[in-house]
Amino acid sequence: MKKLFNFVFAFFVLVGICSANGQKMNIDYESKRNLYGDFVIIPMDNTVTVTDGCITIAPKSEDVTYTISGYFNGQIVNKTKNTVLKLKNVFIENNKGEAAIYGFAKTEISTSRGTENYIISTGSSDLKNAAIQCKKNLEMGGSGTAYVVGEVYHGVKGDDVKFKGSGVYYIQGTESGSTVNCHSFIAEKEKSFKLYMLNSKNGIKADNTIMIESGNFYSYNNGTAFKTDTLADNPAEKHGIFISNGSIRVHKNEKVFDTEEKFCKVRPKVIEE
């Protein structure tokens, strides 16, 4: 039944995307919330602080994994480098214009196999906030499914953003923002993840470079699928798009690549759908 639900949901999301330019992911938040029970975080010890609408995680050492599940309305904050947040059937939403998940230090988001996870950010803010946001580097991995909706500005935002693993990600920003906004974007070798970039000004927008060595990318209804700054924006930095492997499928994008022309090196064939 879980696999059937995944297929049906993905089918209707993609049909909606292909049928009308600018159509958003149609998620019935109310019915989805009801599918998720009480919020649970493991371990729940003195490294976890719970206040009204905020859960702060601050392990004393690096490389600690916290498994989270259930429903939470507010913000989850990580303060320690290399902390892993393992999503195991979780629905996190923030309706105050803030990130639903925020990292002060390098953070990894990992989805558990066979799980469906929702990270939603709504409301208004003068800041260009994302549903998942990290002040430092951010890694997205695992083998489950995540629906990330950033209705404030961006879907995902970090310094250097790396995708890995075999999971499926549906990420949506806004008509002014990006599905992924970062300094540099990296996709590791020999990974099979699927990244659906939906209904935003940009799919992946990097200040410097986009380097992709594997993965499956789907860009639907974005202004530009892959975009970096140029020498005109910042002459002191290297800018370019380098895609050596993986797959790229696009539908209703105004432009696929936007970077320094001599530094746009793409090996896989771009498939128009």
Predicted regions: what they are:
Residues 21-273:
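A composition-driven surface/loop motif
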Residues 11-19:
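Hydrophobic h-region of N-terminal signal peptides that target proteins for export
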Residues 2-10:
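Sec-dependent signal peptide recognition
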